[in-house]
């Protein structure tokens, strides 16, 4: 429908310890030492991608995800998606804070022009933005050592800057 802008929304944590995947090691090296941060520190982001053209919006969340932080991101998304006057429908999962009473009245007030559509429970594979998170991890975090959490955020945000304008890569990645 050309009168609707469909957005995919989700939140993610990028861990400091990174991940190792395929790599090449010279045959003469018996046991390569691979640096790996031993903790469970992570940096969180809200993200949304407009499926029509790949326009994206990302927001770092330094504390935790909850109803207040989600509401702040929804307001930011509403502002970013108003440029063309289309109705905005946002695909989201069933996290408890997506249904919070805190922003229920706000959502009801905007229901005609800005609404949330929830995925079935326990089905993250149906959310197109999950593929964006996977690509971000592969491009920014695989086979890399991050001695500080700030370096993880820096690496991820460089990718987000590359995706800041509507682009074909995200549009193709998020095709339904």
What label would you give each PLM region?
Residues 1, 85, 109-113:
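Short, well-ordered coil/turn elements that cap or connect secondary structure elements
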Residues 69-89:
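Short, basic/hydrophobic alpha-helical segments
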Residues 1-75:
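Extended, low-complexity cationic-aromatic segments
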Residues 31-38, 108-131, 145:
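RNase H-like polynucleotidyl transferase catalytic core
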Residues 10, 85-99, 122, 127:
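Acidic/histidine-rich, metal-coordinating catalytic segments
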Residues 2-6, 129-176:
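C-terminal anion-handling pockets and recognition modules
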Residues 101-106:
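Distinct, well-ordered alpha-helical segments
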């Amino acid at each position: 429908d050309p009168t609707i802008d469909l957005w995919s929304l989700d939140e993610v944590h990028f861990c400091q310890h990174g991940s190792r995947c395929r790599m090449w090691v010279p045959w003469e090296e018996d046991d390569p030492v691979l640096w790996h941060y031993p903790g469970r520190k992570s940096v969180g982001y809200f993200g949304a991608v407009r499926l029509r053209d790949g326009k994206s919006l990302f927001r770092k969340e330094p504390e935790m995800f909850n109803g207040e932080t989600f509401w702040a991101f929804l307001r930011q998304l509403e502002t970013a998606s108003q440029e063309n006057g289309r109705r905005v429908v946002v695909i989201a999962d069933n996290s408890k804070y997506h249904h919070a009473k805190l922003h229920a009245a706000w959502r009801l007030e905007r229901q005609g022009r800005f609404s949330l559509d929830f995925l079935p429970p326990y089905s993250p594979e149906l959310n197109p933005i999950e593929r964006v998170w996977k690509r971000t991890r592969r491009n920014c975090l695989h086979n890399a050592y991050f001695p500080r959490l700030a370096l993880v955020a820096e690496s991820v945000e460089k990718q987000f800057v590359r995706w800041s304008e509507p682009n074909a890569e995200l549009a193709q990645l998020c095709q339904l």
